[in-house]
């Protein structure tokens, strides 16, 4: 990546001031010593990656931040060495297994809560990957592996990202679905969450913001295999084109500073038995849009058609047709 202008680089002191002000503005907790530990442990990742803010519409929820890494690094070991993660955590084996796939190609990034420290380890698998590869690693219990058939039945056969939530012992698995997403497919995917179907106007809005081939994240309990949530994402939504958003999200997008080359706002509609809410992310430094574009993510206003995905679907359909 070319050198960024000085005002767009990650600066630890400026970040400390910005995180204090943003947390105060949205009523989120903050632990300053934990923040210092994170910044020291992952200094290179913040300096060379892209940093973003995150929160949800839930009152008092955490102000979170993430680096999308440009460095190939074992961030889990670094978190353990810094005292941010327990070396005996029961889900370490899952991250190890996923990180070793495809000759060790997956890239690890880190999510942190301002008030609690290490939150998630995020993995980009290097492109479209068969869901079978991701969801049948031996480190996953049979209850989780058994979910594969449910996803394949919905046409969710390819995964691009996953994130392990250390605190909740769960994982978000990010599928790219062949679209366009319609009300029938939305309802089928939403039913996995077990939550009450949303109002028609909510569904209409979600569909209006989805690219043709869409991203849906499914949250799995890593012990029971229960599906806890489903979330649909819209990326790089300009402020003048935002959907209807809750007051807390509007406040967050107003006050969270972005020193990035391009402003990149992400909206997620999350549905689950414990309640529905809206997520938001906002670029901070490091050219978040460049990283996401390099990972073939689709932005608001783009056609969003994944030709590789469609070729894979066509091959699968022709193979199944020939087997009849």
Curated annotation (Swiss-Prot):
Q: Which InterPro entries match?
A: Aro_prenylTrfase, Prenyltransferase_CloQ, PrenylTrfase-like_sf
What is its EC class? Answer: transferase
Q: What changes when the gene is disrupted?
A: Cells lacking this gene produce antibiotic compounds (vanillobiocin, isovanillobiocin and declovanillobiocin) with a methoxy instead of the dimethylallyl group at the position 3 of the 4-hydroxybenzoic acid moiety of clorobiocin.
User: From the UniProt record, which GO molecular function terms apply?
Assistant: prenyltransferase activity; transferase activity, transferring alkyl or aryl (other than methyl) groups
The protein's annotated pathway: Antibiotic biosynthesis
> Which biological process, per GO, is one annotated for this protein?
antibiotic biosynthetic process
The protein's annotated catalytic reaction(s) are: 3-(4-hydroxyphenyl)pyruvate + dimethylallyl diphosphate = 3-dimethylallyl-4-hydroxyphenylpyruvate + diphosphate
Q: Which positions in this protein are listed as binding substrate?
A: 160, 281
Changing residue 160 to A/Q has the effect of: Impaired prenyltransferase activity
Indicate the impact reported for residue 215 to A/S.
Answer: Does not affect prenyltransferase activity
Q: Which UniProt keywords apply?
A: Antibiotic biosynthesis, Prenyltransferase, Transferase
Give the function comment from the record. Magnesium-independent aromatic prenyltransferase that catalyzes the irreversible transfer of a dimethylallyl group to 4-hydroxyphenylpyruvate to produce the ring A structure in the clorobiocin biosynthesis pathway. Clorobiocin is an aminocoumarin family antibiotic.
The text of the family note is: Belongs to the aromatic prenyltransferase family.
- Quote the protein name from its UniProt record: 4-hydroxyphenylpyruvate 3-dimethylallyltransferase
Q: Which organism is it from?
A: Streptomyces roseochromogenus subsp. oscitans
Q: What broad taxonomic lineage does this protein's source fall under?
A: Bacteria, Bacillati, Actinomycetota, Actinomycetes, Kitasatosporales
């Amino acid at each position: 990546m070319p050198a960024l202008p000085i005002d767009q680089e990650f600066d630890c002191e400026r970040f400390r001031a910005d995180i204090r002000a943003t947390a105060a503005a949205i009523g989120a907790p903050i632990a300053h010593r934990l923040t210092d530990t994170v910044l020291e442990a992952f200094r290179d990742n913040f300096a060379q990656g892209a940093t973003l803010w995150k929160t949800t519409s839930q009152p008092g929820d955490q102000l979170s931040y993430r680096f999308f890494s440009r460095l190939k690094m074992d961030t889990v070991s670094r978190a353990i060495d810094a005292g941010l993660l327990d070396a005996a955590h029961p889900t370490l084996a899952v991250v190890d297994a996923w990180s070793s796939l495809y000759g060790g190609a997956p890239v690890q990034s880190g999510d942190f809560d301002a008030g609690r420290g290490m939150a998630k380890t995020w993995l980009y698998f290097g492109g479209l990957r068969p869901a079978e590869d991701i969801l049948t690693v031996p480190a996953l219990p049979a209850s989780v592996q058994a979910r594969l058939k449910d996803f394949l039945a919905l046409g969710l056969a390819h995964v691009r990202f996953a994130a392990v939530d250390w605190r909740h012992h769960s994982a978000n698995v990010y599928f790219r679905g062949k679209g366009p997403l319609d009300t029938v497919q939305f309802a089928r995917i939403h039913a996995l969450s077990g939550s009450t179907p949303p109002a028609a106007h909510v569904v209409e809005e979600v569909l209006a913001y989805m690219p043709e081939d869409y991203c849906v994240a499914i949250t799995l309990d890593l012990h029971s295999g229960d599906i806890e949530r489903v979330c649909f994402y819209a990326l790089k939504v300009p402020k003048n084109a935002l959907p209807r958003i809750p007051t807390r999200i509007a406040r967050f997008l107003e006050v969270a500073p972005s020193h990035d080359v391009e402003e990149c706002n992400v909206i997620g509609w999350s549905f689950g038995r414990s309640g529905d809410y809206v997520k938001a992310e906002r670029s901070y430094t490091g050219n978040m849009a460049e990283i996401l574009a390099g990972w073939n993510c689709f932005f608001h206003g783009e056609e969003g058609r994944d030709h590789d995905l469609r070729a894979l679907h066509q091959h699968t359909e022709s193979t199944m047709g020939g087997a009849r």
